[in-house]
Amino acid sequence: MKRLLVWLSDLRVAIVLLLLIALASAVGTAIPQGDPPTSYVDAYAETPWLGLLHGEQVLQLQLDHVYSSGWFLGLLAWLGLALILCSWRRQWPALQAARRWIDYRTPRQLSKLAIAETITCPDAEAGLTQLSAVLQRQGWELKPGLNRLAARKGVIGRVGPLLVHTGMVLLMLGAVWGALAGNRLERFLAPDRTLDLLSPRGDSQLSITLQDFQIERDPAGRPEQFRSLLALSDSETPEEISVNHPLRHRGITIYQADWALAAIGVQIGRSPELQLPLQTYPELGDQVWGLVLPTRPDGSEPVFLSLESEQGPVSVYDSDGSALTLLRPGGPAEEVKGLPLRVASVLPASGLLLKRDPGVPLVYLGFAVLLLGGGLSLVATRQLWAVASDGQLHVGGLCNRNLAAFAQELPLLLQRVVAREQHDSPQSVQSS
């Protein structure tokens, strides 16, 4: 059991787990997440993903929902356990050890430290007092003794690794909570249509009505921005959302995710305007909508109407695929199959993405703790001891970070002590 705990808390195991989680996240970014199963089968039927995985294998490996898959959550749990064990076995004892005072009593003990210096002075005890005063002004914590001194600075840096581990655990807990308890809903909503969100008991939680939807396009006709004006059932003021500017309301985040064409208004002959639903035709292109429209009362002699934007034009094709004419929304009628056909309007639809993720506050807290711990980890923990003996002041020190800089600062510190001596006797500095 002890060997298992030692292995789980090994830093190398945590690094391997982090790499696996990063690799899994990259896969989740490369493969679309949350689409219908048939879309993966169709997408990877002829061209397997990376030349290895067909659609069925993608589904079997749960790569269509990586972040909520059992194996991904298992990796997060394993990493969380490894971090907790590492903190318990390594970081917590290191913090406790840093908080304990070590009492070095003899010059011989100091000479074995990573940094050691000795100055010769007529009054070593006065030099010890001067050293204590200099260190106190620099913010060191002191513990004086009989003819000796212990000092430390930056012990708070030892808290940094613990906070880093705590932040990572909180972050992973928030991610798991969001994956298990969160909800995601994608819907296309036409203007003046309402989307009702129901609780598990069937009660209405929130109603969202699309009051207006605008598509901003560049001079070439490419969409640049989408804007939706939403009316919420529990709010008197409409809220506008756009790409990269979502709405957060009662724990639900509403994103402007996409757009589509919902319906087309046509007039055949002297008929009133007929609003007919459009459907997508992926075989004709990524963003092609259309419908089959009969031109006779018995449903015969149909024509096919297709368009790529709400601005048109609307292409009209015969049943054999030959082009008949082009129609502009709101423009004049054109004769098709002996009847005047006019496109009165095209109704766009707003693609809304609704997310409820209860783990987000925990994720934010985890990031904050992680950043705080990372900052504190940069603080070097320095320890210094001094012993006055036989007209000499022996000084030694340890540092867990940037030892070379501390080794350069220690002689300068001793020079300040020497400069404050009130005696005129010669002094020398020797490296031990």
Curated annotation (Swiss-Prot):
Protein origin, superkingdom: Bacteria
Pfam family, one: ResB
InterPro entries in the cross-refs: Cyt_c_bgen_Ccs1/CcsB/ResB, ResB-like_domain
UniProt KW keywords: Cytochrome c-type biogenesis, Membrane, Thylakoid, Transmembrane, Transmembrane helix
GO cellular component: plasma membrane-derived thylakoid membrane
Record's keyword annotation contains Secreted: no
Membrane association type: Multi-pass membrane protein
Transmembrane segments: 11-31, 69-89, 159-179
Localization annotation: Cellular thylakoid membrane
Family affiliation: Belongs to the Ccs1/CcsB family.
Quaternary structure (record): May interact with CcsA.
Job of this protein: Required during biogenesis of c-type cytochromes (cytochrome c6 and cytochrome f) at the step of heme attachment.
PANTHER family: CYTOCHROME C BIOGENESIS PROTEIN CCS1, CHLOROPLASTIC
Protein name stated in the entry: Cytochrome c biogenesis protein CcsB
Organism name: Parasynechococcus marenigrum (strain WH8102)
UniProt gene name: ccsB
